[in-house]
Amino acid sequence: MLSYRGVAYDTGTNFATGQGDLSRTVWDESAMEAEISLISDQLNCNSVTVYGTDLDRLAQTATAAIERELHVLLQPRLVDRPVNEIMDHLAEAARLAESLRKQGAKVSLTVGAVHLVFTPGLIEGDTYHERMANVYADAEHYLLKPTARVDVAAAAPRLNEFLAKAAVVARGNFSGSVGYSAAPFEVVDWDPFDTIGLMYQYLPSGQTPAEHKDLVGSYLRWNKPVLISEFGTATYQGAEKKGFFFWDIVDRAQDVPTVLDGYTRDEGEQAAYHLKMFEIFEDAGAAGVTVSEFIHPTHPHSTDPRLDLDTASMALVKTIRDDFSDPASGYRVEPKEAFHAIADHYAHLGFQEIARGGR
């Protein structure tokens, strides 16, 4: 039984998107509260992963989720910054989580995600995008430009030394459950953590159901709850087969980014992928699942297929900007087919849990 049924919610992360300092240029607290209400009341989640860089936004969003009786998995993200800054940022987030916990909130903390890629100094590459390219140096890229090849096994001691320090910082400021969200290619010592999180969308290619079950099942030997921290795929035919590179279908060399030829929007296929994976994850023994992601404002929807960046997005809602070309424009959201399919599935699981006497 998937005890946690959630969605990931980006409050704005300092990725280099080319559309502002954070991945959410527009931030409006009332809009955020409306989106969190959609997550609790219509998507039928009982959990939400709140991640991002700005601590005030994290606090606002976590509070809104708690007010709607959602479990919050708080995940601070600080990309391409020195380790001491990352640790200070984590400590602040941990203190926030502890404050919420003491008020009776259901809150857990993760010390971050995919640090081999997000954090400099652990593998070759000066920037987030360069490190990502290097991890997948042998894959087919359109956007990424590898500058080296990464030996993830050789990088494991550096990663685990970093994670051990992060766990100490987290536990020094927070008394609840502490975890980490790892990409499948990261070789992690899970001893310092209460839960195992898998950033499942980082698989380099599509897998068979048996391969998925074997992968998730391989983590059960740690005797800790295994959570699918994030998973999803984009909104076009064949996206699942591209694995992690579902997003790599946009020509960004032009002034106006355009979807490459040969890709057809298909909301139904995206929805079917999620339903299939829910069954696989439950059969494999996962304790919870988080769909990635609720909204992706840097990828707005357009009725022009060439401009429809939402096609390359995992988001469950379309971002429809007032001014398509302006990242700072206001917007409205419109649920996609995957939203409705997931809502029905989560509602069904919730009814099953109630029938079994669960929470």
Task: Please annotate each region the language model reported.
Residues G172, G176-V178, A182-P184, D189-V259, ...:
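Glycoside hydrolase catalytic-domain groove-lining segments
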Residues G125-A154, K241-R265, A312-T319:
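A solvent-exposed, charged loop/short amphipathic helix patch at secondary-structure junctions
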Residues Q19-I39, I86-A97, S181-V187, A271-F278:
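Short, acidic/polar
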Residues S3-Y9, N46-V50, V72-P76, V107-V111, ...:
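Hydrophobic faces of well-ordered beta-strands that scaffold small-molecule active sites
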Residues R95-A156, G179-F185, T290:
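Active-site groove signature of glycoside hydrolases
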